[in-house]
Amino acid sequence: MDEYIEIKGARINNLKNVSLNIPRNKFIAIAGVSGSGKSSLAFDTLYAEGQRRYVESLSAYARQFLGRLNKPECDYIKGLPPAIAIEQKVNSRNPRSTVGTSTEIYEYLRLLFARIGKTYSPISSEEVKINNTDDILNCAFQYADGTKFAILSPLHIIEGRTLAKQLEMDLQQGYARIWANGTFMRIDDVLADAEQLDALRPNDVYLLIDRMSVSHEKDSISRLLDSAETAFYEGDGTCRLVFLPSNITYDFSTRFEADGITFEEPNDNMFSFNSPLGACPECEGFGKVMGIDEKLVIPNTALSVYEGCVQCWHGEKMGMWKDEFCRRAAKDKFPIFEPYYALSQKYKDMLWHGLPSDKHHTDAVSIDAFFKMVKDNQYKIQYRVMLSRYRGKTICPVCHGARLKKEATWVKINGMSICDLVEMSVANLLKWFNDLHLDEHDAAVAKRLLTEIVNRLHFLVEVGLGYLTLNRPSNTLSGGESQRINLTTSLGSSLVGSLYILDEPSIGLHSRDTDRLIRVLKELRDIGNTVVVVEHDEDILRHADYLIDVGPDAGQHGGEIVYEGNLADVYAQKEKLTRSHTVNYLNGHDHIPVPTSRRCWNQAIIIKGARMNNLKGIDVKLPLNVMTVVTGVSGSGKSSLIKGILYPALKRHLDEVAEIPGEYVALEGDWRQIRHVEMVDQNPIGKSSRSNPATYVKAYDAIRQLYADQPLAKQLGFTAQHFSFNADGGRCEECKGAGVITVEMQFMADLVLTCEACHGKRFKKDVLEVTFHNKNIYDVLEMTVSEAIEFFDQYGQKTIVNRLRPLEQVGLGYIKMGQSSSTLSGGENQRVKLAYFIGQEKQDPTLFIFDEPTTGLHFHDIQRLLKAFNALIERGHTIIIIEHNMDVAKNADHIIDLGPEGGNQGGYIVCEGTPEEIIKCEKSYTAKYLKEKLL
C-alpha cells in the first residue's frame, strides 16, 4: 500500500502547479490565509478526484443518479483512497429529519424497543404479555405440592348456537363439568334444570379441562402441559387457573391483550414516524399541525391577563372578552395579575379551555371559545383576516409533539418510552444507557444494538453535541453542528482505509469542546483512516501530525505550498520569520496583540427575564459604543439570547419588521440611542448567482456610470445599463451575460462551454470597444479587488476606490470583481456585508450583531477584522459578537460568558466584565482558555 498520496502539478483555481506528498493514515491540517487555495487543494483536488474515481467505477445506469464531477486540472494523483467530504452545510431541509435519524441512533432505538420493549396497559399499568404453557406451569409451581387447582377455558359459543346447544356439543366431546359463579356443575345436571340454565350468563361460564394437584413429578408436569394446551385451544387462546378451595384465579392468554384492549405487538415500524404504521394519525409524523399558535396569541409572556397578554383580546370590541374573563376569574381564584410565564399549567388550561365556573353560564369565556366564535363568523372578511393572523404551526394536540401514535408510547424499557428517550439530552441519554440493567435474556438480545447506540452517543458527546436532543429537527442545526453530526455518523460506521476531508470542524465550538473534537479526529485516524482538515484553529493545528500551509497570501499571491512538515519542525524555527503566516504565528514570531486599554461605557441596553429555550430568566446588560463578545460552550444559550431575543425585540422597538422574539420580560436601558440594528450573518449576499461583491458594495454602479460617460459610449448612445450583464442591451444575448453555456450530459459531467458569441467576455463586441485607460468592462470584472483599487486610484476615481477599499480592509482583496456570490464561503459572505457597512457614510448609531465572524479566518485575517470593528466603533456604532475565538475575546471591551454547560445545564450568566475580570472567575471555561491568551 502507498505510504503517501502523491499530487503532481495541481492547477485548480489559483494553485500554481502544486506538487506534494501527503502521508496516509495521519491527521493532516491544511492552513493558510483566506483565499490562499486551501479549499482548492482539499476539496477541488483531493475530494473531487477521489469522488470522480469512485463514480467512474460504477455502471452508466448508476452514474446517472449521482453527482457528476469534472476531472481536476492536475498531472496525476497517486495513492488516493476513497474520499469522504464532510462540509459545513445543513444537509437536510426535510422537516421529518432529526438528529436521531441522521445519526442512525433512532433506527437502533426502534429495533431495541421492538426486540426488548415491554408493553404496559394504559388502564392498569400492568405489563401485557403473551402467555404459553410454561407460564401456566410456573404459576402452578408457586404453590406447595398437593395444592388442588383446576384448568378452565372460557366457554366459546359458536355463532348461531345457544348456550344449551353449545353445552350439549361439549358434553358429546367428553367434557363433563363447567365452572360458573365460583362453583363446579355437571353439564348434564345444568341441561336438565331449565331454571339453572337460564340463570347462567355465557360470559361467566368456563369449561373444566382438568383437575389436578401441584406435583413436580414428570408425569404430572406432562399432564399439566397437555391440559394447558387443550385449554388454550378450547378457549380460543385464553384459559384460567383456579386454586382450590380459595378460588384464587389467574388468567392467561396467547393473544396480546389486557384490560379489554387488544394491543399491537412491538415491531420496528410501530416506532417510525416516517411510516403510516407508526406515525400519529393527526399530524402524520410531523409533530406539528396548523392551528392557533400560542406565540402569536400571547407574544409577550411577561404580561398578565389583566395587562393584556392575550393579543386577540385587544381593542374596544374584543377587549370585552378580557373584561368578562377577569370578572369571572375571581370565583375560580385565577391570578389575573400574574405574568403568563409564571402561571401553572392548571391556570393556563383555564385561560385556554375555560374556567370551572363557566358551567354556570350559557357561554364560556376562554381563548378556545373566542376562536370558535371567530370560526363561526368566517363568512365576514375581518374574522377571516383575524383567524389567519393567529394561525401557525403548533404542537400536535394528539401526540403532543412526539410524532408517534399513542400505542408506541405504551412500550417501555425500564419505565421509559422511546418518546421519553428522544426528549433527553444526548449526554443524559448516554448516562441512562450506561446505567441500564437488563435481565440475561434481554441483555443477550440487545447487546449489539446497545453497543451501536452507546458508541454513537459517545461520539456526539465527544464532538461537543451533548446538549442536543435526538428529536431536534435537522433543519434547525447550524452548519457546524450539522458537520459534526456527519462526523459522528462516519465514526459510527467504522469505515477504515478512507480519506476524510473536513472543512473547519471547529466552527461553533468553544475551546473546551475543541479538545474533545481533537480526540475524535485522532480516533478516526487510529482506526486506519487519513484525516485532512482545512482549519484555522490554533489548538487543532498544534495537534496535527502534519501541517500543510498554502500561501503566502490570497488570490494570485497565493496558491503555493509555503510549508509542509511536522509540527516539531515548526517549533524548531522559533521566532524566525518565514514565508508562512501560519508558521510565523505558531512559532511565536507573530501574534495578535492585547489592547493597551479597554473602552469605558456608561450606557447599555438591558434585557430583563430572558428565558428562550434554555435561558433561565436572566437579566443581561449590553453596553453601547463598545465591542461586546458573548462567549460560552456550545449550547449555552448565546444564539437564543442575541439572535432569538435581542435582535427581533430591538427591531420591533425600532418599528421595523421582525420575527416574534423569544420570551423575555422587558427591554430597558438606553435602546433609544440606537437608530438601526443589523444582523451580519453568513447567509449568501444575493439571492441570484449573478450578484457579486462589486454590486453588493455599490461599486459596480459607479463603474458602469464611468464607462457610460466615456466619449465612445456617448457617441454610440450607451447608458449605464449597457454595461450590466443582468439587463438586456449590452450583454451577450447568447449566454445572457454569463460568459459560458452549460450543456447537460446524461451520463457524464455537464459540459461548460465558453460562449462562442462573446468568447467568454459576457458583453457584445461594441460594448467591449468602450475602454477606460485601455481597460474594457470585462477586464475590470476579471481584476481582483486589490487590482481594481490600484487601477482606479491611479486615475483619480475616488468614489469607486472608497467603495472597494472596505473589501480589502476586511481581507477580501483577493476575490475577483465579477466573482459570483454563489461561490463565496459563509465567512466571505459575512465579510462582504461588513465591508458594505464600513463603506456606508451615514452616521446613525447602529447596533451590529456578528455571529462567529472569524469563521474561515486565519490569524493574519483576524487582525484585519479587528481593525474593521474598531473603525465601526469609532464612528459611534455598537458591536456585539457571538464568538469562541479567544483572540477576538481578548480584544473585547466587555465579555458576557454564558453557561456553565450546554443544554439544560446552561442558560445562566457565569461571569461578565472586561477580559481581565473574566479570567479571575474559576467557574468559567472561557476564563481558563482566555487566561492563556492574556498572560
Where would I find each of the regions flagged by the language model?
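Conserved phosphate-binding elements of NTP-dependent enzyme cores
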Residues: 1-935
